[in-house]
């Protein structure tokens, strides 16, 4: 099936979806209605671009006819030639856009995410930088209209983040933040540095798609759940009733502790959400590691320890090492204005996928 047959099939399906969504039987079936609505929304951009492309093709045909019929009218012929030139340029742009729109979609792109940030090499400075990254993602989420909920956090003595787990919910969250997994390096002069020397520290980021129970069911026999008293600063127990939850997935050893909520059930529900995402991600990584060629055709190598970005404070510079992008906008990016970085990563990934399809 060539690209035009594919596009026509997408348009035919889009029109079929419009009819189905008007069917009373479908409207009364909430689950099916939501699934079909999502499918229609996911194909709308492709169909709109395809219809505009067909209009451009018609304009080219009309302009060519006008040139043939314009003998003896230089002004009309010149106007038709200009329209033909513009339409041919638009045709090429639409063809590139449509190729990208037809690329296989990542099934996780529309999902919410579990975001984990940890201070790594560099002690207190790494923890402080982890806090900077947390603020950056929170502010970026605000610009996108997403909901950002800190589910669990651990701070150190200087107010830095040892570890934080957050849920980010909204439209197409994973599609934009999936490229953030990896090691983020910071170069700056710490507040405690009296000699003005630049130190290098690292924080790690992990982005996992939220996994619903219907998508990945964990056998309860594989879980060990411990209930204990939540502890506050200094280690004292802050609740008379045991509400904190420690959940361990026995086959993998993956562990989650949750004590942010006031009730045991809420802590259990949050712990289950995180452990389901981590276990699913664990096995997805094993499968991905067996597909080296495919992994190398996309952004980075898929290695979670890969250094993906450097934030240089003295030079106000951010460098993404995977795509060779350098921006003298560190303050802007850390304030949550990440679009320029994320858009470049998306474009690079799409280009690489197109190249792999053409080879």
Curated annotation (Swiss-Prot):
Gene3D superfamilies: 3.30.160.20, 3.30.70.1660, 6.10.140.1950. Transmembrane segments: none annotated. Pfam families: PCRF (PF03462), RF-1 (PF00472). InterPro entries: PCRF, Pep_chain_release_fac_I, Pep_chain_release_fac_I_sf, Prokaryotic/Mito_RF, RF-1. Methylated by PrmC. Methylation increases the termination efficiency of RF1. It comes from the Bacteria. It is found in: Cytoplasm. GO terms for molecular function: translation release factor activity, codon specific. One of its GO terms (cellular component) is cytoplasm. Keywords: Cytoplasm, Methylation, Protein biosynthesis. The modification N5-methylglutamine is found at residue 236. HAMAP family: Rel_fac_1. NCBIfam families: prfA (TIGR00019), PRK00591.1 (NF001859). Belongs to the prokaryotic/mitochondrial release factor family. Peptide chain release factor 1 directs the termination of translation in response to the peptide chain termination codons UAG and UAA. This is Peptide chain release factor 1. It comes from Streptococcus pyogenes serotype M5 (strain Manfredo). The gene is prfA.
